[in-house]
């Protein structure tokens, strides 16, 4: 629901694995009428590429399932930066050693289909295949990369669900703001 509130996103697809452990995700998507693409559990880059290809996406916006409190305005901010031009990839954070200024759990990455296709064709490292877009930003000069920083710096805030404790906090937040 939160991603679909973006002013820029015209289509939403959940890209999950073809592992039977993720059948509940497929059931949830079917129940909600949300398109679902299933692909490799380990070659996530291939899953994203095949999904984007099947759905004929020109621009790919990647947010992850461990970010259920993602802010649609943050998604739009990164998309707008990408659409301004001058880059093949835009994100509001990169892995360390890069400094994070957006809260953990608001992670948004945007790239063109052409850049995703090049990554899919050329990424050969396991890490690049598993984490989808490192091929686009790991080698300076290979692609035009734009980092969308947050001011003031909110990089220490945490709105993700990676642990049981995170889940309990998320449930409490959702309960407090149920309406």
Label every model-predicted segment.
Residues 163:
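Short, conserved phosphate/pyrophosphate- and ester-handling motifs at nucleotide-, phospho-/glycolipid
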Residues 1-3, 29, 136-137:
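Hydrophobic C-terminal alpha-helix "anchor/cap" residues
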Residues 18-85:
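Short phosphate-binding loop-to-helix
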Residues 10, 58, 88:
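Conserved acidic residues
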Residues 23, 32, 70-157, 168, ...:
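Conserved core of the sugar-phosphate nucleotidyltransferase
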Residues 175-179:
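Left-handed beta-helix
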Residues 1-21:
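N-terminal glycine-rich phosphate-binding loop and ensuing alpha1 helix
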């Amino acid at each position: 629901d939160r991603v679909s509130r973006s002013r820029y996103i015209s289509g939403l697809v959940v890209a999950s694995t073809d592992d039977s452990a993720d059948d509940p995700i497929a059931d949830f998507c079917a129940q909600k009428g949300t398109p679902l693409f299933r692909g490799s559990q380990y070659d996530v880059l291939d899953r994203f590429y095949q999904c984007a290809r099947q759905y004929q996406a020109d621009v790919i916006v990647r947010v992850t399932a461990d970010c259920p409190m993602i802010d649609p305005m943050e998604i739009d901010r990164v998309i707008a930066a990408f659409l301004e031009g001058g880059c093949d990839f835009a994100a509001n954070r990169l892995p360390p050693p890069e400094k994070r200024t957006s809260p953990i759990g608001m992670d948004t990455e945007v790239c063109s289909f052409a850049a995703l296709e090049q990554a899919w064709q050329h990424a050969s490292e396991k890490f690049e295949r598993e984490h989808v877009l490192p091929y686009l930003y790991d080698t300076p000069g290979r692609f035009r990369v734009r980092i969308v920083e947050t001011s003031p710096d909110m990089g220490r805030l945490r709105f993700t669900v990676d642990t049981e404790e995170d889940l309990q906090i998320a449930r409490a937040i959702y309960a407090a703001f149920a309406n």
